[in-house]
From Swiss-Prot:
Residues 1-19 form the signal peptide. Transmembrane segments: none annotated. Disulfide bonds join C45-C57. It comes from the Eukaryota. Belongs to the DEFL family. GO terms for biological process: defense response to fungus; killing of cells of another organism. One of its GO terms (cellular component) is extracellular region. The keyword Signal applies. This is Putative defensin-like protein 312. It comes from Arabidopsis thaliana (Mouse-ear cress). Coiled coil: none annotated.
Length: 69
């Protein structure tokens, strides 16, 4: 259950970030088109890299929680 609550928190964090970021206007392009093609600025690229890193951390933490139980 701790992994599930962490995922809910992660989704809320992403929604908050997307609403605060200028990327929210082009978020549909960002998900459909390859991220490297839609990197028009430094902020968008950093946000994408941060998102992927956070996603990786969530996967690793969930795997660790599953193994520890």
């Amino acid at each position: 259950m701790s992994c599930f609550s962490f995922l809910v928190y992660f989704l809320l964090f992403i929604v908050t970030k997307m609403s605060q970021s200028p990327l929210s206007q082009s978020s549909h392009e960002f998900t459909v088109v390859s991220p490297y093609l839609s990197c028009f600025g430094i902020e968008e690229c950093l946000f994408y890299l941060y998102f992927k890193l956070y996603d990786l951390c969530v996967i690793l933490l969930c795997t660790w929680f599953d193994l520890s139980e």
